[in-house]
Amino acid sequence: MNAIQIQDCGFWLIHVNQDIYFPDNNLPFGTAESLNLTHRNAARIGEWEGYPLFVVKEDPAEQREWTALRSLLRLPEEKFYLLNRGVELNYFLKTHRRCGKCGHQTEMARDEWAVQCQNDACGYRTYPVICPSIIVAVRRGKEILLANHTRHMPKNGGSGMYTTLAGFVEIGESFEQTVEREVFEETGLKVKNIRYFGSQPWAFPNSQMVGFLADYDSGEIRLQEDELNDARWFHCDQPLPELPPEGTIALKLINATLNICRQA
């Protein structure tokens, strides 16, 4: 990142971890001087409402009225994705301050999203670490498989949120193999007819959600209890439990699968 210049003007992404400074329901706009940012470093990461968008180097001690990134899923996709870019870039920079090959200090490259080792004898270049995770909706006839994960424990007597299955891709594994493995590990079910649906950047802290649709093949539900509280089949015409929020690829997968169920 470069030192911010007094004349730099645009929208500014200021954040700590996944908390965004979002006053008046938008990012702050103005010159660096008017926003008291001239002592900071930043990088331009795109355009926001026709103006440059800068992400400011993260300061963990910064105190502001924050808005959780998850709550901004309601924004148009292109805006939410830009916020993810900035948050992930700062996460990459703060976790790669030193070269993983020789241990010397790194600095951000000028020609691409990367950090460059400052040891002339090394010069190793490291790129942002993006951890792909599959997310899959499984259909059986007119039914959809939904699960209540341990991180969505029911509260106040409710049923808790039910959603799709997901998991990280392992080394030497295709996305389709990950779908098969994750579904089987978490529920004991085998799936077939796996097909790509879409993807979503997910800065929690550095994932890429890769969405798939799949059909039930065989097996009975057997829970991986350290991951799931419950998993069951829901008929497309019956009342559904609490679902993921708008803007998530999980809800898009669920809605797409329900539409297929109703046409089956």
UniProtKB/Swiss-Prot annotation:
Enzyme class: hydrolase
Keyword annotations: Hydrolase, Magnesium, Manganese, Metal-binding, NAD, Zinc
Matching InterPro entries: NAD-cap_RNA_hydrolase_NudC, NudC-like_C, NUDIX_hydrolase-like_dom_sf, NUDIX_hydrolase_CS, NUDIX_hydrolase_dom, RNA_Hydrolase_NudC, Znr_NADH_PPase
Motif position, Nudix box: 167-188
GO biological process, one term: NADP catabolic process
Reactions it catalyzes: a 5'-end NAD(+)-phospho-ribonucleoside in mRNA + H2O = a 5'-end phospho-adenosine-phospho-ribonucleoside in mRNA + beta-nicotinamide D-ribonucleotide + 2 H(+); NAD(+) + H2O = beta-nicotinamide D-ribonucleotide + AMP + 2 H(+); NADH + H2O = reduced beta-nicotinamide D-ribonucleotide + AMP + 2 H(+)
UniProt KW Ligase keyword: no
Gene Ontology CC entries for this record: cytosol
Residues binding Zn(2+), per UniProt: C99, C102, C117, C122
Cofactor note: Divalent metal cations. Mg(2+) or Mn(2+).
Positions annotated to bind substrate: R70, E112, Y127, Q200, P201, W202, A203, F204, P205, N206, S207, A250
Binding residues annotated for a divalent metal cation 2, in chain numbering: E182
Ligand binding (a divalent metal cation 1): A166, E186, E227
Matches recorded under Pfam families: NUDIX, Zn_ribbon_NUD
EC numbers on record: 3.6.1.-, 3.6.1.22
Family: Belongs to the Nudix hydrolase family. NudC subfamily.
Complex and partners: Homodimer.
Known function: mRNA decapping enzyme that specifically removes the nicotinamide adenine dinucleotide (NAD) cap from a subset of mRNAs by hydrolyzing the diphosphate linkage to produce nicotinamide mononucleotide (NMN) and 5' monophosphate mRNA. The NAD-cap is present at the 5'-end of some mRNAs and stabilizes RNA against 5'-processing. Has preference for mRNAs with a 5'-end purine. Catalyzes the hydrolysis of a broad range of dinucleotide pyrophosphates.
Name of the protein this chain belongs to: NAD-capped RNA hydrolase NudC
Organism: Actinobacillus succinogenes (strain ATCC 55618 / DSM 22257 / CCUG 43843 / 130Z)
Gene this chain is encoded by: nudC
